[in-house]
Amino acid sequence: MKLQLHLALSLLAAIVAANPIRLDQRQITGNELRDGSCHDVTFIFARGSTELGYLGSTVGPATCNVLKLRKPGQVACQGVAPAYIADLASNFLPQGTNQIAINEAKSLFELAASKCPNTKIVAGGYSQGAAVMHAAISTLSSTVQDQIKGVVLFGDTRNKQDGGRIPNFPTDKTKIICAFGDLVCEGTLVITAAHLSYIDDVPDAADFLVGKL
């Protein structure tokens, strides 16, 4: 088991090293719910393992930017951080992430609902961030869940384990995007090139979320 964990972590680290983060993306923080005023739409996102910043470096900031373009002046973007550190080892825990990350995500949904009762919440997660969303959203109160209009999950590490859905949450509000050949969607933690391809799916994901507003 220790050897398997070491090999998996080594593979993940090698892929991260081969996929450098752009400086402009790294500087995006996405702390607008906590630090800003209420907006018509609040986008809450959990980044993938090893990604930096509040929104991460790939699909998180890209989805935020597309939403802001399609709903000018109406969208606040909030990443699940800093308590959620997006470490590699937490992928191997029973829920695919750790309880600290889950609690932080839950608290952000609850903050959006209490601070901005009229905002429409949309959400997303990538890789381990998708696992964060599965666990957090499934345990929210029905009142807060009702305020969530749509969720998009990229490269969902809990896709197979949870039957292609977020437990206790409407399937028509959920879009799980799994690229052909992405083995994490099949219940493994084997990282292939397909797991790094989701930037191409951002427009479709944003269309889904906008369509739910």
Curated annotation (Swiss-Prot):
Q: Which PROSITE patterns match?
A: CUTINASE_1, CUTINASE_2
Q: What is its EC number?
A: 3.1.1.74
Q: Where is this site: Transition state stabilizer?
A: S49, Q128
UniProt-listed GO biological process terms:
carbohydrate catabolic process
- Residues forming the catalytic site: S127, D182, H195
List cellular component terms (GO): extracellular region
Main location, first listed in the record: secreted
Residue pairs linked by disulfide bridges in the UniProt entry: C38-C116, C64-C77, C178-C185
InterPro entries reported for this sequence = AB_hydrolase_fold, Cutinase/axe, CUTINASE_1, CUTINASE_2, Cutinase_monf
Induction (UniProt)? Induced during growth on cutin, in a manner dependent on transcription factors FarA and FarB. Induced during growth on suberin. Induced during growth on the lipidic carbon sources 16-hydroxyhexadecanoic acid and propyl ricinoleate (synthetic cutin monomers), triacetin and triesterate (triglycerides), and olive oil. Repressed during growth on glucose.
What is the reaction catalyzed? cutin + H2O = cutin monomers
User: What's an example of a GO molecular-function annotation for this chain?
Assistant: cutinase activity
What's the protein name?
Answer: Cutinase 1
